[in-house]
Amino acid sequence: MESFLFTSESVNEGHPDKLCDQISDAILDACLEQDPESKVACETCTKTNMVMVFGEITTKANVDYEQIVRKTCREIGFVSADVGLDADNCKVLVNIEQQSPDIAQGVHGHLTKKPEEVGAGDQGHMFGYATDETPELMPLTHVLATKLGAKLTEVRKNGTCPWLRPDGKTQVTIEYINESGAMVPVRVHTVLISTQHDETVTNDEIAADLKEHVIKPVIPEKYLDEKTIFHLNPSGRFVIGGPHGDAGLTGRKIIIDTYGGWGAHGGGAFSGKDPTKVDRSGAYIVRQAAKSIVASGLARRVIVQVSYAIGVPEPLSVFVDSYGTGKIPDKEILEIVKESFDFRPGMISINLDLKRGGNGRFLKTAAYGHFGRDDADFTWEVVKPLKSNKVQA
């Protein structure tokens, strides 16, 4: 059987784009914690010695935006200009306005509409994906790239590798076999890690530490062999990083946030958006639908699409493709999905409890992926029993 190579990348929490995602979601958390009806569309950008938050927020919450920005930067590890940003001394700019009254009346009637009547906050189409190649029902390339990034941060923060700095990127290439539409990983072909570091460490020390403390604990031994290629800081030097090295912006890592290039993406980012924004809530409900299909045994691999019009509660379309792995025709899987899931934005918010902030709930989603996470706050990862007599017991 012929094999092929597929690659997914990730970035860790100190990447400037991910820093912005986390600030936007920390602000969303703070608003929802005090006022679950908050309407939030919060963007963040950053460059050397500066963070700016801007957008539209209508809330009864009393939120100190500057304090949230500095706290988020500090907790990631941006505590001095040497590492890319000084949380306590950088400039923080805030330009937040209220939600447009035109949008407010069309979507939620200035909070007068019942949940089932709440319209989509904008037009758009979202995709959910699931595959049986990992316990998380996520693509292995994405899972490993994401876990490598998380491990980089762990060994930096716990002091195992004190030379590490916050910024970093990972990439994993895997050799696959297509088994009648299902994806079967054979081996890891290439591992790439580029991580920010201090001036004192040598490239040999970097490579040795990354293999021992990052790659070894994350990638199962069965996927590594003598032919596996390792590119460890291949540029040779990565001292300047974070916002000092590159500008950052909310919503620029949407493939990392989802499925690592597998499935499809409608283009809408997640972070800084309350659940009336179907870019987020729509993507969450179709992930739950896709995961539930695979977990129930109806298919080994599946993609689900939903689409919306602004101000309209009911979706315009729902689509299912099982890539030929379905135990029953896709048309029948689609009917089961439509019967089992309520795609109206107001009902998604209720059924997935998306108006609940606090506990760093959405902040947690903003680094290391929104899907495939084992965390009670990730309610869309709960497999839902499907309404059909064709589902495996």
Swiss-Prot record:
Bound cofactor: record note: Binds 2 divalent ions per subunit. The metal ions interact primarily with the substrate. Can utilize magnesium, manganese or cobalt (in vitro). Binds 1 potassium ion per subunit. The potassium ion interacts primarily with the substrate.
Cofactor or coenzyme needed: Mn(2+); Mg(2+); Co(2+); K(+)
Reactions mediated catalytically: L-methionine + ATP + H2O = S-adenosyl-L-methionine + phosphate + diphosphate
Cell compartments where the protein resides: Cytoplasm
Main subcellular localisation: cytoplasm
Amino acids binding ATP: 15, 167-169, 235-238, 246, 252-253, 269, 273, 277
Induction (record text): Induced by cold.
Name assigned to this protein: S-adenosylmethionine synthase 4
Segment forming the signal sequence: none
Assigned EC number: 2.5.1.6
Organism: Arabidopsis thaliana (Mouse-ear cress)
Expression by tissue: Detected in trichomes (at the protein level).
Residues that coordinate or bind L-methionine: 56, 99, 246, 277
GO CC annotations on file: cytosol; nucleolus; plant-type cell wall; plasma membrane; plasmodesma
Pathway: Amino-acid biosynthesis; S-adenosyl-L-methionine biosynthesis; S-adenosyl-L-methionine from L-methionine: step 1/1
Annotated binding of K(+), by residue: 43
Transmembrane segments: none
SUPFAM superfamilies (UniProt xref): S-adenosylmethionine synthetase
Gene Ontology biological-process entries: lignin biosynthetic process; methionine metabolic process; one-carbon metabolic process; response to cold; S-adenosylmethionine biosynthetic process
